[in-house]
Amino acid sequence: FNKFIVENHSQLGKIFLMKLLYKIPLFSFLFIIAFETLYASEVNIYTSRHYDSDESLYAEFTKETGIKVNVISGKGSALLERLKAEGKNSPADIFFTVDAGNLWKVQKEGLFSRINSKNITSIVPKNLRGPNDEWVATAKRARVIFYNPKKVSESEIKNLSYEDLAKPEWKGRIAIRSSSNMYNQSLVASLISNLGEKVTEEWAKNFVANFARKPQGNDRSQIIAVANDEADIAIANSYYLGIMLSRSKGDEQLEAAKKVKMHFPNQQNRGSHINISGAGILKNSPNKDNALSFLEFLLSERVQNYMVNISFEYPVLKDVLPNPIMAAFGTDFKIDEVSVASYGELNPQAVKLMDRSGWQ
């Protein structure tokens, strides 16, 4: 699939052999049936996920089903433009990405088909699916507060909410990445959904005034800033701490991760903001049955166990436990149950609001 030259040669070979065998009707018929079956046994995935572990996931799917997985990787925005350009001729079956906002963008363009599977809709909560089941969550992540216990007291952190971070006592103490980051845009969109735009904008202005430094770096950079005393607290996705504690990013990041603790905000009211990894079947998919099989595979108990143990995300299935590293921080924390689809719907307002608040 992502080796178009090989694919084109295969297509030419198919035509040649069909012509060659034309005069042998029965053999030709059987050959064509076998060839078409083999040719159809694939699923083409466009993904913006950046996890090396996904390759072994695809290999396991092929081993279990016999369906070959072809992958095109890239940034979500670039893949969306590619899908639009390909139109009805697109070979893509699945769009697989992180952040509900990215799924919403594809949905808005009308590029998804509805997922018609009771096996999926019966196990994935409505707030973790597209409004009309255009896409579905495959894993969850929380956007939480990381803090330096030497700088932040237990009384300060105990019932801390996102809203509290706009208070004067946090001035010069907060690290977070830029407003161009989709994770932050979705966080602000969730606040708009819960609090309204006016209240959220006032919050954002005061929140920005409390930054310890100009927004910079990725999520792990924010955690490292707390470990290095450049900030007292940071906002980042939960799984990054798991990655760092696993030593997969080296001893330096392991030592940084050991210096911080993780806090789930808003446990006294609506719960912590969550986002998702998710996927949908594309409208022009040439292999819809295979695509559905892949989604059902991702949401099986065995694969959910595998995924969360590799990615350090949280499972969608309630009977699956997270990686032990993440479970050590708690498994029964309260989550905000607002529809994650609202992150995409409210994204334009969130981006404009962040700009008005001075969030760089």
Regions found by a protein language model. Give the residues of each.
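Periplasmic-binding protein-like
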Residues: 141, 204-208, 213-217, 254-283
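Mature extracytoplasmic/periplasmic domains
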Residues: 277-337
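Bacterial N-terminal signal peptides
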Residues: 25-36
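Extracellular/periplasmic bilobal clamshell ligand-binding domains
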Residues: 324-360
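Short beta-strand->loop
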Residues: 112-121, 135-136, 163, 251-273, ...
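Extracytoplasmic ligand-binding site segments that recognize negatively charged/polar headgroups
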Residues: 48, 52, 74, 78, ...
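A ligand-binding cleft/hinge motif common to bilobed small-molecule-binding domains
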Residues: 101-105, 233-257
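Early extracytoplasmic/lumenal segment of secretory-pathway proteins
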Residues: 40-105, 360
